[in-house]
Amino acid sequence: MGEDGKLYIVREEILSDSIKKTIKVKELLESGKAKTINEAVKQVGISRSAFYKYRDYVFPFSKFSKGKIITFSMVLEHMPGVLSSILDVVAKERGNVVTINQSIPSMGVASVTISIDTQYMEISIEDFIEELSKQPGVRKIEVLGE
């Protein structure tokens, strides 16, 4: 795959064991829990050849999202304070809102699109999404793009 290869966001549960193990090896090396590739692949239970095959092609989403503008699509219940609680989480995690677009509520819900600059955020995007989804009134949240 060349530099212009397409990138995809794929949920972890559909990845093959080899790819999951490659990611785990990279995490062990990055965290210092394993000093060498040989040590890390033995801990995880993957061959070195499988690791080398995938290592340059798999990255956690957070590696690409740090310092970028990410657009989220949300479905929020039409209740006082729901959007405000979302914005409180963004501010608490040091995100900067670039744009907000909210539809007129229909049948008790409203669609909201928010673009956030993640440059100063310390939290991973995965944890950020989880924190947003725990807010009262949030029915659905997904990443549209960056």
UniProtKB/Swiss-Prot annotation:
Coiled-coil regions listed: none
Superkingdom of the source species: Bacteria
SUPFAM superfamilies: ACT-like
Disulphide bonds in the chain: none
Domain annotation ACT: ranges: 71-146
Family named by the database record: Belongs to the UPF0735 family.
Record HAMAP family: UPF0735
Protein name: UPF0735 ACT domain-containing protein TTE2621
Organism: Caldanaerobacter subterraneus subsp. tengcongensis (strain DSM 15242 / JCM 11007 / NBRC 100824 / MB4)
